[in-house]
């Protein structure tokens, strides 16, 4: 989910809006932790971009763990998993934009920037939904496809 989210952000901010390149997009993520220094050029800039990618993957993994522990055990049907995933993805976007980004050291986008609807839908469909559907298949309440010992 971290990769699909990053790919969507790349399309919107790099290809459509022309506001970043791929490196500066990842540096923007790192700047939440390090401030403006993340926009350094050269080798340091590449390091900050790698840090940004790591932060993005780490946050995404955290959201997967939260879903796996708190929501997945309660979901009984694929339809319920899909609905829970879409809602969860939208809540991730809301949490990131109202709590995490404002607490960071970066200069973040206004809450209602020109792309907020696109990113809200993207988080619902490309982040929350895959988390829910993938983890639905691993829910221990259904018969496992693996042979038992």
Which residues make up each language-model segment?
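Extracytosolic (periplasmic/ER-lumenal) interhelical loops and adjacent juxtamembrane/interface segments
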Residues: 14-47
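Interfacial helix-loop-helix junctions of multi-pass membrane proteins
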Residues: 98-120
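Internal alpha-helical transmembrane segments of multi-pass membrane proteins
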Residues: 73-94
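Aromatic-anchored segments of alpha-helical transmembrane domains
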Residues: 2-7, 89-99
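Hydrophobic cores of alpha-helical transmembrane segments in multi-pass inner/ER membrane proteins
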Residues: 122-136
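N-terminal signal-anchor transmembrane alpha helix
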Residues: 1-19
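Short, charged juxtamembrane terminal tails flanking transmembrane helices
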Residues: 137-149
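Hydrophobic alpha-helical transmembrane segments
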Residues: 50-68
């Amino acid at each position: 989910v971290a990769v699909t989210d990053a790919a969507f952000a790349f399309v919107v901010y790099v290809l459509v809006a022309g506001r970043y390149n791929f490196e500066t997009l990842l540096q923007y993520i790192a700047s939440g932790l390090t401030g403006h220094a993340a926009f350094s050029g050269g080798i340091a800039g590449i390091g900050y971009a790698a840090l940004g990618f790591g932060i993005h993957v780490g946050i995404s993994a955290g959201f997967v763990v939260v879903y796996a522990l708190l929501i997945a055990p309660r979901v009984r049907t694929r339809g319920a998993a899909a609905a829970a995933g879409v809602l969860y993805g939208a809540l991730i976007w809301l949490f990131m934009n109202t709590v995490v980004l404002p607490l960071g050291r970066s200069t973040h986008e206004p809450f209602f920037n020109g792309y907020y609807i696109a990113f809200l839908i993207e988080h619902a469909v490309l982040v929350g939904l895959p988390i829910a559907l993938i983890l639905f298949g691993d829910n221990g309440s259904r018969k496992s496809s693996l042979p038992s010992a």
